[in-house]
Amino acid sequence: MVTFVSMSKKGVLLVNLGTPDSPSVKDVRKYLREFLMDKYVIDLPYLTRWFLVNVIIATFRAPKSAIIYKQLWTKEGSPLLIYGLKVQKLLQKKLGVDIHVAFAMRYQNPPINKAIKELKNKGIDDLVVIPLYPQWASSSTKSSIEKVKEELKKQHYSPKVRLVETFVKNEKFIAAIAENGNKHWKTGKYDKVLFSYHGVPERHVIKDCESNYGNNHCKLDGNCCKTYTDKNRLCYRAQCYETSRLVAKAMNLKETDYEVAFQSRLETRARDPWLKPYSDIVTADFPKNGVKNVLAFSPSFIADCLETTVEVGDEFKEIFEENGGENWQLVESLNDSPLWIEALEQLSLNND
């Protein structure tokens, strides 16, 4: 008697945040509206959020943002999309034909619903979802995961799903960041390293900790993030500090060699502060404290984008030099580096 064993068909879904379809004001406004209307990004009541986003932010910010996106845009298009598609192809090659790799953006294109349809049509019944945000946050990771769940339900598609919520402890991910940094740090030209992470409202961090752990472990006082434990594993701030410690260790940095700060704040209310210290203020203060040469990382971004190339690479450099700084160097993001692809291979195969 012959017994046939049914083999599961495996797939991986990579999800990044998103990018406008073009640097035109129209497309930038469309992107901002979809992004900022997400209840996980701006968690205000719907009507308040709608007015804030559609009447104020998208109206006045889109023309300014379009100018910045034009600086970033290449002949191929948006770097975030270009690298996303490259990584998809490289990971597909790494994993081989037995595991199908799909790629989507949480906002705009390629959309999550299209990727889910692709996986369903391929007959994938064992799916790994990897949101491409190293540090878990409700405004990025949770939002993407919930969107994937929503689309799976809409399409009546029920594969076995494994979610990769965070990968700050993945050794190859850390090694990839350190490898890029050491190209510059080992030249001996720099006095200080800045690890600049995307900011989020303090309120989000506290609320997420209470939601995830049912306690008020998060004090935002510097002490609760000194160690990374089960009690703060999904605390965004704790993950940022843990990432910094691990990269510093991989680069043989002393604690006094680096600073951690938070960028890209969008304070919608005076009493709604974002995570501190603020990267732009830390940058301005460096020269005043005798720091003239800085090596800057953006470890919350796995591909170069507006926040890395323009904000950290150009705007912070200008702030630094205006205040007496001499040498500002942005470390490139992981983009499509071999170690980053190896990290994704591990995460896909659950060998983290």
What are these regions (language model features)?
Residues 4-352:
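Active-site-proximal alpha-helix that buttresses catalytic centers in soluble enzyme cores
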